[in-house]
Regions:
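Short, thiol/selenol-centered motifs that function as redox-active sites or metal-ligating centers
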Residues: 111-122, 129, 167-189
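Non-globular targeting/processing and membrane-anchoring segments
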Residues: 23-163, 240-378
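Sec-dependent N-terminal signal peptides
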Residues: 4-13
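Active-site/pore-lining binding-face segments in mid-to-C-terminal subdomains
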Residues: 196-261
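Short, intrinsically disordered low-complexity segments
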Residues: 143-169, 214-229
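Thiamine diphosphate
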Residues: 191-193
Length: 378
């Protein structure tokens, strides 16, 4: 019975499309080719929105004592995130990063479940492509669980969000453990939490699989799902947005095993790129293929020093600006320090401060941002 409820919960939205327009049906079956700007009936799965409200502490339906306590805690934490991270970033973005508002499609490799900062820095995107090693995850019906299990899940979810809320990034080692549990089983959970807290409505969530031509098909086998597609929109907007999350190894060897993703990326054409707390993987030879896609297909790139090394950026971008401070890397990544990048930060009178701290250099009270633009495309 629970299995039946789960299938109805996850795929009820598919049945809803049978009574929609032919355009909506076509888009449902081949979601990677859906144009967010096309005016077509929005397909809703109310259970997906209800789940998003519940895990984000915004539901008015659960009045249990345990949930009300979780709700109060979530509200308090969110207020701190807004005051300490979001508002300072918004002020900085609007003052110094105006071109990001022109970006409609964003690629965020090594993202984990970090929808929050992608959305804050790039507020107008219609399409968000997120990639990480962590599993995509699946939803469940909260009411199908005993109260102790629901409370255990919410406690574990809060724990998994700690580093993102406090430091501005997810720790890879923590995610490996925290997002591979029975209920908290992938990045879908932090993504949905941040979507709801950011004021978005979840229209539907579709487990999916890549096809050889780089398109996506809805997958009924959630145990083997490699990706999730989330359709969402802002209150008061008619435009529907789409988020793709892929669980893929972006190393050269990993991409050889998943050529369909490489084709998917090529099919996207030009996009903006966001990189943060990326473990300096793009500094390393085994990640040269994905680095090449980033350099070739990006119109604008916003990153910290853990992203693409400066020596590669200089050959592809017409304008490179730096913000914040860059004097060192943490000991774990000391070998990736860039003296050439430090020289760009040398004139502190000309380099604007960020007014916020996110990323690896928390212990030094430093944040660095690199903003690169191809003038011919913006």
């Amino acid at each position: 019975m629970k299995k039946l409820l789960f299938l109805i919960f996850c795929f009820g939205c598919i049945a809803c499309t049978t009574s929609g327009s032919s355009q909506a049906d076509k888009n449902q079956n081949n979601p990677s080719k859906e144009d967010a700007q096309v005016s077509s009936p929005v397909v809703m799965n109310p259970q997906h929105q209800a789940f998003a409200l519940w895990i984000s502490g915004l539901s008015t339906q659960d009045t249990s004592a345990g949930y009300l306590k979780y709700q109060e805690s979530s509200n308090n934490i969110w207020r701190k995130v807004v005051a300490g991270k979001i508002n300072p970033i918004l002020n900085f973005r609007d003052s110094f990063l105006a071109p990001v508002k022109k970006v409609r499609k964003l690629f965020y490799p090594f993202s984990g479940g970090d929808f929050l900062y992608a959305n804050v820095f790039f507020p107008e995107i219609d399409t968000l492509i997120m990639v990480g090693l962590e599993p995509p995850g699946s939803l469940f019906i909260p009411d199908s669980l005993p109260t102790p299990e629901r409370q255990s899940y919410l406690s574990k979810l809060s724990q998994s969000l700690f580093f993102s809320n406090e430091l501005g990034f997810f720790r890879t080692l923590s995610m490996e453990k925290e997002l591979k549990q029975i209920r908290l089983n992938g990045t879908l959970h932090p993504i949905v939490f941040y979507l709801a807290r950011s004021g978005y409505q979840i229209n539907r969530i579709l487990p999916s699989k890549l096809l050889s031509d780089g398109s996506l098909a809805v997958s009924a086998d959630t145990s083997r799902t490699q990706s999730n597609i989330i359709y969402y929109q802002k209150a008061g907007e008619t435009k529907e947005r789409v988020l793709y999350y892929f669980s893929i190894d972006l190393s050269d060897s990993g991409l050889k095993q998943t050529p369909a993703f490489t084709q998917f990326l090529k099919n996207q054409g030009e996009f903006g790129v966001f990189l943060k707390a990326a473990s300096y993987l793009l500094h390393q030879a085994p990640f040269s293929t994905i680095r090449g896609h980033i350099l070739e297909q990006s119109s604008v790139l916003l990153q910290d020093d853990s992203g693409v090394p400066l020596k590669f950026l200089k050959n592809q971008f017409d304008d490179i600006q730096v913000f914040g401070e860059y004097t060192q890397t943490i000991p774990l990544f000391a070998s990736f320090y860039q003296p050439e990048l430090k020289s760009l930060f040398a004139d502190s009178a000309k380099v604007r401060k960020t007014g916020f701290i996110i990323g690896y250099n928390q212990q030094f009270r430093q944040t660095n941002l690199i903003f690169a633009k191809k003038m011919r495309t913006l």
